[in-house]
Amino acid sequence: MRHVRRALVVTILVAAAAAAVVAQAQPLGQQQASLQPAKEVAPPQPPVGSVSGLPVPRFVSLKSDKVNMHIGPAKTYDVKWLYQRAGLPVEIIAEFETWRRIRDAEGTEGWVYHSLLSGRRTGMVTAKAADDLVPLYDKPDDKGAVTARLERGVVANLKRCSGEGWCFVTGRGFEGYVRQTRLWGVYPNEKVD
């Protein structure tokens, strides 16, 4: 008797499922297309700081000739490093209230008070060897005339970067085009206006 009841319950369930499928089916010719237009997908956005709403990471520069880098996000934390060069490019890698965690060209990281940073874009000339000089051209082309040769560590103002390999820079006594890959302070393929 028990087996008969189970078989009956299973039969009822199978019949109900089949009836549901048949009820949803429509005769040929009466089927309606249910294609919906594809939803537009926004391109991925870079992460933004929880305080500023600006992209993180991003490059900025030091606003003052004396900037303390702390080991934590408050003046009560020990000073890790003292920068003495206004205009030095640094990378903001995190935000906490009025403090920004930065990284310098040598990879040193720490916290700086936000008002000691500027949105002015600068780049530091990089070279493989200390005596290596980086050519500055009169146009964005390796075949252009070399107007100057810049030493490693020279800081230049980024006026514009094409995002295609070249930046127009200015500094004390020079202006011209330099390969974007020879500057620390701008991302590869980043466009700067």
Locate the predicted segments by residue:
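Boundary at the C-terminal end of the N-terminal hydrophobic targeting segment
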Residues: 20-27
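SH3-family beta-barrel domains
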Residues: 27-71, 82-86, 93-96, 103-105, ...
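Bacterial N-terminal signal peptides
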Residues: 9-19
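Beta-strand-rich domains and repeat architectures in extracellular enzymes and scaffolds
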Residues: 78-79
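Bacterial N-terminal signal peptides that target proteins for export
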Residues: 1-11
